[in-house]
Amino acid sequence: VGGIIIYIGILLYFLVNNNFIQNTHYIIFVSFFFLVGLLDDLSNLSSSFRLITCFIFTFIFLIFNPEIRINEILIFEKNINLNSYLNYFSIILITTLSILLLQNAINMIDGMNGICAFFIIISILYLNFNYLYLEISFFILFLILTFTYFNLMNKTFLGNSGSYLLSSILSYKILFINSNELGLTSEK
């Protein structure tokens, strides 16, 4: 239930602020993962089906949104520009696998709703030092804190819909910041 409330809150945020159209890519990205998580909550999808479905969607999404991808990695305090060493599809594959890794890591702790929620809160606060999507990030923080309050009262739980939704929000934000630092995207 908590994931549904957070998802509806995010959609309402974009509708109220009249920037639904400008953020279509973001909404499609997080909506897909939310729906996979919701279907899993309702019908207990197999883990291989979820993994393959999310892999295919993410890979196709990244192909059609070339500005959103991992461009640099930090290895032993040295920034490595992947564009200098790898072709486009290799970078898309690495980005896809990174998103799925984060998604599954967060999904593994979704049974511990408080830990999952606070991990997302700390991550979003840390990432907001770049001031990208600042307003929506604080709104999402408000939604997560509200969820956490009701979770502590044993009134709601995050579920796979919530963990998939929050992991997609976090991965999109990380990728957007990475792309923006290289000047590949414009601030929204």
Where on the chain are the PLM-derived regions?
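"…together with the soluble PPM/PP2C metallo-phosphatase catalytic core" -> "…together
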Residues: 1-188
